[in-house]
C-alpha cells in the first residue's frame, strides 16, 4: 500500500499521460523526501521541481517519469545518466535496470547522492565526478542515456556513446528549451522533439 500523497501523485501522473506502470511503480518505491533538504520534505510528493543547492534542482516527478518512459528500458538496459544531482532520478533508474552509470560535475552533489543511494540499499549504481559533456567513454556503449540538464546543442560524445538502437533523452536549448529523443540506427541519428521544458544548463567541465 502506498500513502495517500503518493497515490495522489501517481493519479496525477497518469492523468498527464504517463502510462508505463513499471516507471510509476519505481516512483512509488523511491522516497523522494530522502532526496531533498529537510525544509522541503513536506513538498517532496508535490509535482514540482525543488532546489537542492549549488544552483541545481530535483526535477518534478512528471518530468522524471516522462524522460524515464521515453528511454524504453528493459532490465538488461545499460544506462548512463548525465547529472546525478540529488540522486533521485538515479534511484528511479536503479529500480528498473540491473546497473546505472551516473556522472556529476559537482563533487559535493556526487558525494551526497552516493550516500543517499547507499542508505536506500541501492548498490547497482556507479557514480563518477566528471564533465557530463564527455559522457563515460570507458563504460560505453549504452542502450539508454538520460541528461538532466540542458546543453545548447546535443553533445556529440553522448550520441557516439549510444549503442545501435540506443536512445538518448535530454533537454536542449538556452532561452527556449525542448525535450528531445535521439535514437541511433546504423550511422544515423533520428531526433524527435517531445515537448517544451525548463532545466538548469548543462555546464562544461568539473567543479570540486
Curated annotation (Swiss-Prot):
Cited NCBIfam families: pimt, PRK00312.1
In its UniProt entry, what is this protein called?
Protein-L-isoaspartate O-methyltransferase
Which Gene Ontology BP annotations are present? methylation; protein modification process; protein repair
Q: What is its main location?
A: cytoplasm
Q: What is its EC number?
A: 2.1.1.77
Q: What are the positions of the active site? A: 59
The cellular location(s) given in this protein's UniProt record come to: Cytoplasm
Q: Name one Pfam family in it.
A: PCMT
| Function, in words | Catalyzes the methyl esterification of L-isoaspartyl residues in peptides and proteins that result from spontaneous decomposition of normal L-aspartyl and L-asparaginyl residues. It plays a role in the repair and/or degradation of damaged proteins.
- GO MF term set: protein-L-isoaspartate (D-aspartate) O-methyltransferase activity
Q: Which GO terms describe its cellular component?
A: cytoplasm
Q: Which family does it belong to?
A: Belongs to the methyltransferase superfamily. L-isoaspartyl/D-aspartyl protein methyltransferase family.
The domain of life is Bacteria
Q: Which UniProt keywords apply?
A: Cytoplasm, Methyltransferase, S-adenosyl-L-methionine, Transferase
Question: Which catalytic reaction applies to this protein?
Answer: [protein]-L-isoaspartate + S-adenosyl-L-methionine = [protein]-L-isoaspartate alpha-methyl ester + S-adenosyl-L-homocysteine
Amino acid at each position: 500500500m502506498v500513502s495517500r500523497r503518493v497515490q495522489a501523485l501517481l493519479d496525477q501522473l497518469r492523468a498527464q499521460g504517463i502510462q508505463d506502470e513499471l516507471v510509476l511503480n519505481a516512483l512509488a518505491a523511491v522516497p523522494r523526501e530522502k532526496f531533498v533538504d529537510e525544509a522541503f520534505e513536506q513538498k517532496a510528493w508535490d509535482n514540482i521541481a525543488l532546489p537542492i543547492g549549488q544552483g541545481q534542482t530535483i526535477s518534478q516527478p512528471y518530468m522524471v517519469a516522462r524522460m524515464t518512459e521515453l528511454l524504453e528500458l528493459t532490465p538488461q538496459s545499460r544506462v548512463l545518466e548525465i547529472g546525478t544531482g540529488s540522486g533521485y532520478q538515479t534511484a528511479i533508474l536503479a529500480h528498473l535496470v540491473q546497473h546505472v552509470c551516473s556522472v556529476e560535475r559537482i563533487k559535493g552533489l556526487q558525494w551526497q547522492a552516493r550516500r543517499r543511494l547507499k542508505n536506500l540499499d541501492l548498490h547497482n549504481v556507479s557514480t563518477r565526478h566528471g564533465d557530463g559533456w564527455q559522457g563515460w567513454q570507458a563504460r560505453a556503449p549504452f542502450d539508454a542515456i538520460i541528461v538532466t540538464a540542458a546543453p545548447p546543442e546535443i553533445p556529440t560524445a553522448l550520441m557516439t556513446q549510444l549503442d545501435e538502437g540506443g536512445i538518448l533523452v535530454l533537454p536542449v536549448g538556452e532561452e527556449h528549451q525542448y525535450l528531445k529523443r535521439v535514437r541511433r540506427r546504423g550511422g544515423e541519428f533520428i531526433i524527435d522533439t517531445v515537448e517544451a521544458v525548463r532545466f538548469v544548463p548543462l555546464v562544461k567541465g568539473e567543479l570540486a
